[in-house]
Amino acid sequence: MKTDIEIAQSVDLRPITNVVKKLGFDFDDLELYGKYKAKLTFDKIKAVEENAPGKLVLVTAINPTPAGEGKSTITIGLADALNKIGKKTMIAIREPSLGPVMGIKGGAAGGGYAQVLPMEDINLHFTGDMHAITTANNALSALIDNHLHQGNELGIDQRRIIWKRVVDLNDRALRHVTVGLGSPINGIPREDGFDITVASEIMAILCLATNVEDLKERLANIVIGYRFDRSPVYVRDLEVQGALALILKEAIKPNLVQTIYGTPAFVHGGPFANIAHGCNSVLATSTALRLADYTITEAGFGADLGAEKFLDIKAPNLPTSPDAVVIVATIRALKMNGGVAKDALNQENVEAVKAGFANLARHVENMRKYGVPVVVAINEFITDTNDEIAVLRNLCAAIDVPVELASVWANGADGGVDLANTLINTIENNPSHYKRLYDNNLSVEEKVTEIAKEIYRADKVIFEKKAKTQIAQIVKNGWDNLPICMAKTQYSFSDDPKLLGAPTGFDITIRELVPKLGAGFIVALTGDVMTMPGLPKKPAALNMDVAADGTALGLF
């Protein structure tokens, strides 16, 4: 059986100029990055803004195993299948972060015969967007430290600077650092730290900005820290939003690539869903909606994280609301949520599938609270048995949710046709009545509690002393009308990664609340969620190499 990278490298790629002809593109609408990658020009983005949006489908998942459950694979395969049956379809997904690629994932461009290509480029440096975001973030850090060194006219309290540096790697050694050491000419010594690039507020800003002017306004609104009198200091006080936007002027343009079957795909932006809002850019999704009859997009991790944030944070910024939600389930993840140990997930266990179904059922119920119709996609693995699949089908029928087996990893577009037809039937016969979970005018505590009780099913929310102090500061500064972005483990509905399935009788503890005014939300930190991940004992990087002819090896 071929690996993902072997499949990807066996494909004869089409020139990207040919791929987008079906969308009505001219050569001048693209800024080429070689033969197979391009960015869309601002002129083309502007030209399609008056087009009526097509149908929007969000792909999400149940609580995953550490390897993930194949949301991107299903997203890509479903789009290929829709195109196969004559529906003009585009994809809008996130671009991978190099940290997890070198760490546990080994790649994040789909899998098998449902991939976006060229996968090696997408997984590595792509068009340089991640580096631009990293540079903009760290330029701001340098400008802050220079301001301190040059006399600190704004009266910034260096003990209360909340802006951190970033790097697009998993590097636990950089979580806490001290800068400015050595001598007075090296700046003002202070504690600092590094986050991973995809946790940067600038990543979230890039993914929520609708144009360059909106980008600049959002950058200007970033809070970098506080003065000695505890008043906030914004980027606009430093007057550097223009410089930061200049660094990002190419990165804000959506990237165009293709699937194995030639479906055009926007791959743009990549915030994590456990520490940020977990969705690709508004600009890419909005443009896809105006170019295609169907746009298939995804949100990170399980529906309790990525989908909730898509529906409560991203969707209000789009030209249309979702017409359907596809929840990806795997037999192995159901068994894990049913209590099976990781090393036994490949063994048949019908009873564990039944027990783990409570996790899927809760996600279905949660998505229905938004008024959007739901379809379940079973992402098929070769270890799944007929009895396990049959039980899952029956359980889905019992809660009246359409379900289809998708074998897109093994069979490409053909393996997604049943899912595509069921999705179309669901959309045509069940119009969406989308509504947000909560009103932004509720208090911070009420919004957090609404998410915790309605989505996670917590008994109550406990706000630690630091969080309570921060809420008072948020209210004082008039920031309390923003939506909430929960930072929580992806493995559980709770804030305990070991509490699997559909737990009840637990509390959610909020340890910190961080205003991200540029992004336009408040991050509520729970548990031990890290904004700078570490590498596993045996990182995927150990299996990576490059051949003498430049061919990438070991990505998967």
Swiss-Prot record:
UniProt superkingdom: Bacteria
UniProt-listed InterPro entries: Formate_THF_ligase, Formate_THF_ligase_CS, P-loop_NTPase
Pathway: One-carbon metabolism; tetrahydrofolate interconversion
A single MF term (Gene Ontology): formate-tetrahydrofolate ligase activity
Keywords: ATP-binding, Ligase, Nucleotide-binding, One-carbon metabolism
Coiled coil spans: none
Catalytic activity field: (6S)-5,6,7,8-tetrahydrofolate + formate + ATP = (6R)-10-formyltetrahydrofolate + ADP + phosphate
Enzyme class: ligase
UniProt-listed PROSITE patterns: FTHFS_1, FTHFS_2
Record-linked Pfam families: FTHFS (PF01268)
Binding site for ATP: 65-72
Protein's name according to its UniProt entry: Formate--tetrahydrofolate ligase
Family assignment from sequence similarity: Belongs to the formate--tetrahydrofolate ligase family.
EC number: 6.3.4.3
Gene Ontology biological process terms, A to Z: tetrahydrofolate interconversion
